[in-house]
């Protein structure tokens, strides 16, 4: 059975893990590739403490982001309905469709907070009426907003 050495990754490597992970690798792999190219460093007690502190900070930051997403979801449900104005033909059909970019602009104008349009899922909207769009605010938090399409 071959001897393995522990190293701390300083950048993410697809086959090993993420930045900050402690992994066991073959001594030659560590000595010839990971350490000389700065992709890993040897494990020491001080480095382990640094990793623990860094992970604690990341956890606090992640919880803060989640709480902000929950607060924003509450704000969106408080507002309730967003109105989007579009041009309509004689038969009541829209010129074009309502896109997730249109929804993002409506939310931004009402809340003064930017939302990435790629986080919004909008059904195909080709006519006037009320619709529901889904917004992913965080990995664990999503919201549904009502959209009123008017002329």
From Swiss-Prot:
Biological role: Binds to the 23S rRNA.
Domain of life of the native organism: Bacteria
GO cellular component: ribonucleoprotein complex; ribosome
Native source species: Prochlorococcus marinus (strain MIT 9515)
Keywords: Ribonucleoprotein, Ribosomal protein, RNA-binding, rRNA-binding
Family membership noted in the UniProt record: Belongs to the bacterial ribosomal protein bL9 family.
GO biological process, one term: translation
Stored PROSITE patterns: RIBOSOMAL_L9 (PS00651)
Stated name of the protein: Large ribosomal subunit protein bL9
GO molecular function, a single term: rRNA binding
SUPFAM superfamilies cross-referenced by the UniProt entry: L9 N-domain-like (SSF55658), Ribosomal protein L9 C-domain (SSF55653)
InterPro entries: Ribosomal_bL9 (IPR000244), Ribosomal_bL9/RNase_H1_N (IPR009027), Ribosomal_bL9_bac/chp (IPR020594), Ribosomal_bL9_C (IPR020069), Ribosomal_bL9_C_sf (IPR036791), Ribosomal_bL9_N (IPR020070), Ribosomal_bL9_N_sf (IPR036935)
Protein encoded by which gene: rplI
């Amino acid at each position: 059975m071959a001897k393995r050495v522990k190293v701390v990754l300083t950048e993410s490597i697809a086959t090993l893990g993420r930045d900050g992970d402690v992994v066991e690798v073959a001594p030659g792999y560590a000595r010839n590739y990971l350490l000389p190219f700065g992709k890993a460093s040897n494990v020491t007690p001080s480095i382990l403490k640094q990793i623990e502190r860094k992970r604690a900070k990341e956890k606090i930051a992640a919880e803060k982001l989640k709480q902000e997403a929950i607060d924003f979801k509450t704000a969106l449900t408080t507002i309730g309905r967003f109105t989007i104005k579009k041009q309509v033909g004689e038969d009541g059909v829209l010129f074009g469709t309502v896109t997730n970019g249109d929804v993002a602009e409506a939310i931004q104008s009402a809340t003064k907070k930017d939302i990435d349009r790629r986080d919004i899922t909008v059904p195909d909207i080709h006519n006037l009426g009320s619709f529901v769009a889904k917004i992913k605010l965080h990995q664990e938090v999503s919201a549904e907003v009502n959209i009123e399409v008017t002329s």
